[in-house]
Amino acid sequence: MAKIISFDEESRRALERGVNALADAVKITLGPKGRNVLLEKKYGTPQIVNDGITVAKEIELEDPLENTGARLIQEVASKTKDVAGDGTTTATVLVQALIREGLKNVAAGTNPVSLKRGIDKTTEALVAEIAKVAKPVEGSAIAQVATVSSGNDEEVGAMIAQAVEKVTKDGVITVEESKSLTTELEVVEGMQIDRGYISPYFITNNERQTVELENVRILITDKKISSIQELVPVLEKVARLGQPLLIIAEDVEGDALATLVVNKARGVLSVAAIKAPGFGERRKALLQDIAILTDGQLISEEIGLSLDTASLEALGTAQKITIEKDNTTIVAGNTTKPEIQKRIAQIRRQLEETDSEYDSEKLQERIAKLAGGIAVIKVGAATETELKDRKLRIEDALNATKAAVAEGIVPGGGKTLIYLASKVDEIKKNFDEEEKIGADIVKRALEAPLRQIADNAGAEGSVIVSRVKDSDFNIGYNAATGEFEDLIAAGIIDPAKVVRSALQNAASIAGLVLTTEAIVVEKPEKKSAAPADAGMGGMGGMGGMGGMGGMGGMGGMGMF
């Protein structure tokens, strides 16, 4: 495949054109008065969105050099969303401003490496400043963060705050589409396993088609159980106690399953069985989690334990277990135990070390299950277009809320970035001359988000920026009302993590663009044009078909 190679100023300008094309489409969504973007879909109705990352992901430019610039902005937006969950549009506006100001200086002869160094050093100092001014999130502030990020939807803000309160900081909150018109919150207490009863004969509540057991003993093993002989010793011990028994195994089949069903039907023993969740190594980890949660032991031949010698002490206990066709919920009621906290800390260390998004999600799920909380926000709307837009807003709000709980909050509406700009002169005092230019580029770029918020609200951006610069730390511009007020008191707040991530990611990509000296991209293949009137020319001869009046003329075919 042939390549196109572009050098020096030409390469940087191509990147800038790509950056501007994408950033100009994304930045109009910023702020409470952000405009909508209409996305054409190959199939179905167009989608109306007010979400920066969604717009960014949809854009692909025809020119391969410019498309490289657009891809860099997509990287900024994606990375910010992955780390902080929100702030993608702010990061896009920042990186566009940094690149625009930076390229002006590179074209004027400033050393791009020194510029990058100045940008990096300034950003590092400003990140430390964000940590200093951030306030921990308490009570109603959680609802305020969620309300702002969901496009000022107070109902959503209250719902997310309620979910966070119920599942605690270790819990998992997910967003799903609902079949109804309303948006509802559903909280699952205890550990939920995505496995249901092996046999419907275990059902105890015929109306709900569920198995409901209380004060339960739990046998946890990674074995496949086929013979009842292996289970007899445990069954006899549990029968003497008069408690129900849940068996969690790789599978229960044949003679073993038949005997359990018969004993359940005759009322000899209240028993149920489910398959172990997960696969491979993850299955063992999940079974170990269940064992720790229920104060039991994983019976595995790998560690020298067998079913026929299992003692009562090896069985876990639970206050209540509900088994449905596809799910099982275990309420252990002792999630504050030191062993559980140790297990959570161990999984959290694994979470810090993993680079895989899938593994990260599964580890976070395990933490939530051990901590005893999973909440589901079921999003409803009248139309599919509205549903998708509402779901995106709620996901943004949820991510912003998690970020706020993690690192605290700062005044929103671009005010914190304006405050950081006022610190740059102090930061750059000991920089080299060209590094100071890099610091000034950051200073000017920090004004861009507030200017854009004001422009989107129909105000004069430069005037708003000038007024906010001269006000106290908490006082800023409320674009929703057009007033200057105490932003924290008004509930216009940003998670510190979002501001930090947006600034760091924007500075990182801007530095890459400024120090780019060459771009190598694949040369687009020219679409091969069909030969002029290929085949159609022959069709002209079809006119002669009229002369075929007598098929006898076909005798001439003998020439072949």
Curated annotation (Swiss-Prot):
Gene3D superfamilies: GroEL, GroEL-like equatorial domain, TCP-1-like chaperonin intermediate domain. It is found in: Cytoplasm. One of its GO terms (molecular function) is ATP-dependent protein folding chaperone. It is an enzyme of class 5 (isomerase). One of its GO terms (cellular component) is cytoplasm. Pfam families: Cpn60_TCP1 (PF00118). Together with its co-chaperonin GroES, plays an essential role in assisting protein folding. The GroEL-GroES system forms a nano-cage that allows encapsulation of the non-native substrate proteins and provides a physical environment optimized to promote and accelerate protein folding. HAMAP family: CH60. This is Chaperonin GroEL 2. It comes from Nostoc sp. (strain PCC 7120 / SAG 25.82 / UTEX 2576). The lineage of its organism: Bacteria, Bacillati, Cyanobacteriota, Cyanophyceae, Nostocales.
